[in-house]
Amino acid sequence: MVKVVVDAMAMQRALTRITYEIIERNKGVDDLVILGIKTRGVYLARRIASRLQQLENVTVPVGDLDITPYRDDIDHDAQTEPEVTAANIDFSVEGKKVILVDDVLYTGRTIRAAMSAIMDLGRPKSINLAVLVDRGHRELPIRADFVGKNIPSSQRERIKVSVSEIDDRDAVEIQQA
């Protein structure tokens, strides 16, 4: 059984609200950079950056973060140091206010890995987390600073975020396992 809990309009409103909250919390967009976690976090990050451009008339740098080498749930060769494979980060995070964007916050492990990757890129002034969906069930003490929608769910359920750039539609669904 599949239940749509966020449609395209609700997703658009949530991202717009997150954008306003980012501006308010940071008192503007000075020294702000946005990093989207691959895959869907990248597209959400670009949408937030686009809204920031519209609202503040400033282009905020956006990058794509691949955290695969930093994940603790994948078997890695213990002899090799993780290497940031940030395919699309052409700016420094040193001293910047980083907005880390992902589609779903669940256990917190993806975010922990992303923070490790960011620290390998440099020492940011701060890191704030923006997620479209917070579903609970944390295994690590991580919380989002900006949340589009809280969707309590059981661990047997799956939250699926679809974005039009790769899925041909915008939606958030709960799927029964």
Curated annotation (Swiss-Prot):
Matching InterPro entries: PRibTrfase_dom, PRTase-like, PyrR, PyrR_bifunctional
Catalytically driven reaction(s): UMP + diphosphate = 5-phospho-alpha-D-ribose 1-diphosphate + uracil
Disulphide bond pairs: none
Keyword Cell inner membrane: no
EC number of this enzyme: 2.4.2.9
Listed Pfam families: Pribosyltran (PF00156)
Keywords: Glycosyltransferase, RNA-binding, Transcription, Transcription regulation, Transcription termination, Transferase
Any one GO MF annotation of this record: uracil phosphoribosyltransferase activity
Motif stretch (PRPP-binding): 98-110
Region forming the signal peptide: none
Domain of life, per lineage: Bacteria
GO biological process: DNA-templated transcription termination
Record function comment: Regulates transcriptional attenuation of the pyrimidine nucleotide (pyr) operon by binding in a uridine-dependent manner to specific sites on pyr mRNA. This disrupts an antiterminator hairpin in the RNA and favors formation of a downstream transcription terminator, leading to a reduced expression of downstream genes.
Subunit and interaction comment: Homodimer and homohexamer; in equilibrium.
Similarity remark: Belongs to the purine/pyrimidine phosphoribosyltransferase family. PyrR subfamily.
Protein name stated in the entry: Bifunctional protein PyrR
